[in-house]
């Protein structure tokens, strides 16, 4: 079992129950899924770019990504319907908690000039979005073997009803938010 899953069951549920006065443990918000999305705009001209992005995301998430395709043609971006434009992975269960552990304890401290995560990433319904500018902050990516530095979006979907509950949940998992 993942270390953070045990930590959630033992510590986080008790903290949040006291803080928000929940009547049952089932009311305590939990993380349902984490989605990693890597948009690759240059993939329409070169197929090798999308393959490299897929391999990077597979190393980061330890799960095979799905290639996302353009929904409609846009002439100004030289994109046709059905062209690959990125890749994404949805993590749930044990793999989700293992990725969250690596993200908070290893990857985020490796970000250059890091001063905390912006709080404006919450969407009003208890979900959190953050962007990462370089995939090289993850230890699974070998700096010498990458062709280009790419960013990715991380979406943390929770069962929290408000942003305050979601922020308390993620803070309990040691997310370093700005004050």
Curated annotation (Swiss-Prot):
Keywords on record: Ribonucleoprotein, Ribosomal protein, RNA-binding, rRNA-binding, tRNA-binding
Cellular component GO terms held in the UniProt record: ribonucleoprotein complex; ribosome
BP term (GO), one: translation
Keyword RNA-binding: yes
Entry-linked InterPro entries: Ribosomal_uL5, Ribosomal_uL5_bac-type, Ribosomal_uL5_C, Ribosomal_uL5_dom_sf, Ribosomal_uL5_N
Bilayer-crossing regions: none
Top-level taxon of the source organism: Bacteria
Pfam families named in the record: Ribosomal_L5 (PF00281), Ribosomal_L5_C (PF00673)
PANTHER family documented for this protein: 60S RIBOSOMAL PROTEIN L11-RELATED
Protein name: Large ribosomal subunit protein uL5
Gene (UniProt): rplE
């Amino acid at each position: 079992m993942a270390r953070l899953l045990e930590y959630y069951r033992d510590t986080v549920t008790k903290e949040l129950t006291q803080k928000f006065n929940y009547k049952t443990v089932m009311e305590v918000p939990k993380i349902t899924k984490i989605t990693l999305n890597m948009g690759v705009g240059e993939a329409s001209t070169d197929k090798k770019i999308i393959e490299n992005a897929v391999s990077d995301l597979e190393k980061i998430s330890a799960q095979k990504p799905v290639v996302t395709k353009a929904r409609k043609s846009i002439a100004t971006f030289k994109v046709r319907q059905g062209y690959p434009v990125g890749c994404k992975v949805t993590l749930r269960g044990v793999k989700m908690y293992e990725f969250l552990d690596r993200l908070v304890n290893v990857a985020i401290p490796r970000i250059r000039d890091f001063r905390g995560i912006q709080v404006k990433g919450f969407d009003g319904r208890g979900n959190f979005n953050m962007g990462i500018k370089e995939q090289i902050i993850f230890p699974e990516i070998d700096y010498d073997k990458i062709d280009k530095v790419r960013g990715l979006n991380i979406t943390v979907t929770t069962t929290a009803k408000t942003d305050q509950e979601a922020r308390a949940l993620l803070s309990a998992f040691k997310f370093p938010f700005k004050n």
